[in-house]
Amino acid sequence: YNNITEIQRLQRARAWREVARRIAHEIKNPLTPIQLSAERIHRKYAGEVSDNSALQQSTQTIINEVQHLKRMVSEFSNFAKIPESNPQLSDINQIIKETLQLYHDNMPARISLTTELSEILPQLPLDSEQIRRVVINLVDNAISSIEKKGTLSRIFRQGEIIIRTRHVPDLNIVCLDVEDNGTGISPEISDQLFEPYTTTKQHGTGLGLTIVSQTISDHNGFTRFRNLDSGGVCFTIELPVT
């Protein structure tokens, strides 16, 4: 049964990649001329109308939305062209530390990010760039979830993200946990969470967790999640030790 389910998932993933490739191709072409035209109009009449005029607001809206569409197209393209992994024996803790450098000066003020990395881990066959992208996707998701919870609740609560690694010798795996105290995963989408285009974000594409799941599958691992009793969610990446 599990093998059949995995085959079906891979078949759906291939079909969705083709859809993503076509969407990216069809949307990408007209975006640049639309943006350039809006910017040209914006510059041409900037001195003739007030900053708050309907023309200025409308052209700025066009420019902003085109930028949003370009980001979506980029995600579609990344999903459609997930490269085959090129694993080499690596220190997953080092990959995590290097990746988290990106967040040192960019974390929202009310969110703390801490690590609990096991000091004794075996090296793993990893594509370091792909694992780096997995960590970024999971941390970005955690930040979004915490920020969403903050807008829904009137009571301020410090946002917390915890990243931990651990070795499970009995199962011959290393686990990477990314835990947050955000909104958790809604039961309505839990069964489809790793399917493409499943999202609750206003401007999300629903591809981040799909890319995470596919990448870890390519590493012969598993991606799991569980809602926490205290609120929030913990994503667990299980990677085999060779």
Regions found by a protein language model. Name each.
Residues I4-E26:
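Conserved HAMP-HisKA connector
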Residues L31-Q67, P87:
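Histidine phosphotransfer helical core of two-component systems
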Residues N86-L100:
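A conserved beta-strand-to-alpha-helix junction within the catalytic ATP-binding
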Residues I92, G184-Q192:
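Short helix N-cap motif at coil->helix boundaries in the Bergerat
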Residues R110-P122:
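Conserved catalytic submotifs in the C-terminal HATPase_c
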Residues I143-N172:
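ATP-lid-like helix-loop hinge signature
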Residues I216-S217:
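Detector for a conserved hydrophobic position within an alpha-helical segment of the HATPase_c
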Residues N220-R226:
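Glycine-rich ATP-binding loops of the HATPase_c
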